[in-house]
Amino acid sequence: MDNLNRVASGPDVRTLMAEIGREARKAARTLSLASTETKNSALLAAAAAIRTKAGAIAAANAQDYAAAQAKGVAGSFLDRLKLDPSRIEAMARGIAEVAALPDPVGRVLARFERPNGLVIERVAVPLGVIGIIYESRPAVTADAGALCLKAGNAAILRGGSESLRSAALIHDCLVAGLLEAGLPAAAISRVPIADRAAVGEMLSGLNGDIDVIVPRGGKSLVARVQNEARVPVFAHLEGVVHIYIDRAADLAKATKILLNAKLRRTGVCGAAETLLVDRACAATHLAPLVKTLLDAGCAVRGDAAALEADPRVSPASEADWSAEYLDAIISVRLVDGIDGAIAHIEAYGSHHTDCIVTEDPAAADRFLAEVDSAIVMHNASTQFADGGEFGFGGEIGIATGRMHARGPVGVEQLTTFKYRVHGDGQIRP
């Protein structure tokens, strides 16, 4: 398997990917039986290796960054690609935090006894082999590899060409951790070629050797995965995130939340993209909120009321209401109370993350109950839509579907279950 991770050309893509799949399946069987101590040892060794190689990772990332910059890619893309010393340390710390999490494998989720004396247990087990397809985020290599390992799953990582140098070094650190703990290197495999045909092979399921696909990237990548995958997918297509300012909102609190939700990092999927303001508080809240955004360097595209609130506002088009900007841009609209906010979110949202700012508990309860998103918030920045912030030790992605996993996908969501039935000679009449 080591040779596969060094190959740049040679065997055709289908043959290469089939071998990666077979080796990952073998490794998954080993991982499913690995002890908590063994998995944690591998994770801690990987974290230590990343710290040791931090300088080399930063240098490789600088090359990736310069190459992407020369191509003229968007600022939000560059932000996701960048690994400075603090982000590299955060990556190592994140792996160690995953090691400190409770082992999700082997948990008894339910236990009951039947009238005939059978004792039935529902027990958490690994999913198997997880394929992760990602673009500009080299840190996904560490996050995804660590989370899959903790949950007893093998991982097949296919990063984008833009982060190839960074991802290769991070992957080397993960493999070093595996080998130090006596686990197979194929437990965390990296697709060593940039050929897009490799993605197609992964989406086919590699002859049954991939159990789940997780895409991390732009809309076109996620759409392709969702349309073409022949195995289950954990994903979200877009993060059209709303903040609704209710008539009972505290203006100072709303301002603080809004600025953080929009501008802390504009390129993350939890960044706010649309501000909805209750018409009942527009006279006191709309202009100050819009001014604060504009003064902070955020472009505002708004409806007629927002245009009147500040001459720097540009008119919003219909497309703006469903736009995921991933930039310092926000759309602003007045709505008729909580009914209007919920209706707007239902019409234009992406079921990712939405927030209400209010001091009215009844309004908050209704919003949290009726907005059909994976994450709904009350009086908190939407940038908390993150597995690490949820205490999951990071995330492999955020899922907005309804099957199996929804919201941040952490170690618990990377397991399924089986039933263990204990008897004492019972036969069925």
Curated annotation (Swiss-Prot):
Pathway named in the protein's UniProt entry: Amino-acid biosynthesis; L-proline biosynthesis; L-glutamate 5-semialdehyde from L-glutamate: step 2/2
Enzyme Commission number: 1.2.1.41
Cellular compartments per GO CC: cytoplasm
Source domain of life: Bacteria
Record's keyword annotation contains Nucleus: no
Keyword vocabulary terms for this entry: Amino-acid biosynthesis, Cytoplasm, NADP, Oxidoreductase, Proline biosynthesis
Keyword Oxidoreductase: yes
MF-aspect GO terms: glutamate-5-semialdehyde dehydrogenase activity; NADP binding
Reactions catalysed according to its record: L-glutamate 5-semialdehyde + phosphate + NADP(+) = L-glutamyl 5-phosphate + NADPH + H(+)
Subcellular location: Cytoplasm
CDD domains per UniProt: ALDH_F18-19_ProA-GPR (cd07079)
Pfam entry (one): Aldedh
Classification via InterPro entries: Ald_DH/histidinol_DH (IPR016161), Ald_DH_C (IPR016163), Ald_DH_N (IPR016162), Aldehyde_DH_dom (IPR015590), G-glutamylP_reductase_CS (IPR020593), Glu-5-SA_DH (IPR012134), GPR_dom (IPR000965)
Family: Belongs to the gamma-glutamyl phosphate reductase family.
NCBIfam families linked to this entry: PRK00197.1, proA
HAMAP family assigned: ProA
Function of the molecule: Catalyzes the NADPH-dependent reduction of L-glutamate 5-phosphate into L-glutamate 5-semialdehyde and phosphate. The product spontaneously undergoes cyclization to form 1-pyrroline-5-carboxylate.
Protein name: Gamma-glutamyl phosphate reductase
The species this protein was found in: Methylocella silvestris (strain DSM 15510 / CIP 108128 / LMG 27833 / NCIMB 13906 / BL2)
Record lineage: Bacteria, Pseudomonadati, Pseudomonadota, Alphaproteobacteria, Hyphomicrobiales
